[in-house]
A protein has these predicted regions:
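Conserved HGGG/HGGXW glycine-rich cap/lid loop of the alpha/beta-hydrolase fold
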Residues: 15-69
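Conserved acidic catalytic loop of the alpha/beta-hydrolase fold
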Residues: 78-96
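Gly/Ala-rich beta-loop-alpha elbow adjacent to hydrolase catalytic centers
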Residues: 99-103, 107
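Flexible "cap/lid" loop of the alpha/beta hydrolase fold
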Residues: 120-152
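Alpha/beta-hydrolase
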Residues: 141-206
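Short beta-strand/loop motif that positions the catalytic acidic residue
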Residues: 211, 217-219
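Conserved alpha/beta-hydrolase "acid-adjacent" motif
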Residues: 224-230
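Catalytic active-site module of serine/aspartate enzymes centered on a nucleophile-bearing elbow/loop
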Residues: 240-267
Length: 267
């Protein structure tokens, strides 16, 4: 497998956004928001699922990831302007949005603030807003923590570990594509990871209660990263939300992605 061609959108302020397109060229348009951290380059089983779908998925790197220009101090709601520009460049007047984990709030921002263009929103293993009483994160301390976690992950890879930590698999170090994905996320993407964490810990810049488009929320029964409390909160505060539960952890198998893609296509 080789990664799809990377495209670059130049913004009027001199910044760029990098993205890849997956799925059939005539498919139903969807803008996909990566988890935190992640990359526009996806692992083979997910690429196969996107290829089977009836969707044309634009997977972009938020500022600070993958060569997309960093934007220090960005908020979750700032993703709306990026998505509007990306959709305009594709000629998409209307489209759906999808977000996994830390990408979930960014997809929900589009559902809330681009309701005239967003048809539906799917969220996988999404997080809820931070507790207002929680102490603010300090960037320097957070950057140190991110660097430590990234070093641990890449150390596991150097020792012959698989790309995904969800189970046994071939050594990622022997797969150039896997190594490219890992380096993009855990070596070159730490600015984006830090900025995501800061944005998620601050007010998001929109009200969940104002969302009017259909929202599907998927969570795993054994998610060790994001507890069921997050999905419960989102279901309570988003008037149009419907919940779906699958057996498994934070990263589901291809069948769940197939289900999500089918849901998006039929809304």
């Amino acid at each position: 497998m080789t990664h799809p061609e990377t495209s670059e959108l130049a913004r009027g302020d001199g910044t760029v956004l990098r993205y890849c397109l997956y799925g059939p060229p005539d498919g139903y348009p969807v803008v996909s928001h990566n988890g935190s951290p992640s990359s526009r380059w996806k692992w083979p089983t997910l690429v196969e699922s996107m290829g089977r779908s009836k969707l044309r998925l634009l997977v972009y790197d938020r500022p600070g990831y993958g060569g997309s220009t960093r934007r220090p101090g960005r908020t979750v709601a700032d993703a709306v302007d990026d998505v509007r520009a990306l959709a305009d460049a594709q000629g998409w007047e209307q489209f759906a949005v999808f977000g996994g984990s830390g990408g979930g709030p960014h997809a929900l921002a589009c559902a809330a603030l681009l309701a005239d263009r967003v048809i539906s929103c799917a969220v996988l293993s999404g997080v809820k807003p931070a507790d207002p009483g929680k102490p603010a994160l300090e960037e320097a301390e957070l950057r140190s923590q991110v660097a430590e976690v990234a070093a641990e992950i890449m150390g596991r890879i150097d020792d012959g570990g698989p790309e995904l930590p969800t189970g046994p698999g071939p050594a990622a170090r022997d797969d150039p594509d896997a190594m490219a994905r890992l380096r993009a996320t855990f070596v070159d993407g730490t600015d984006g990871w830090v900025d995501d964490s800061l944005a998620l810990a601050r007010p998001w810049g929109f009200d969940l209660a104002t969302i009017t488009v259909p929202v599907g929320l998927w969570r795993g029964t054994n998610d060790a990263n994001v507890s069921s409390e997050h999905a419960d909160y989102l279901l309570e505060h988003i008037p149009t939300a419907q919940g779906y539960v699958y057996p498994g952890g934070h990263l589901p198998g291809a069948a769940v992605y197939d289900e999500i893609y089918d849901w998006l296509h039929t809304r």
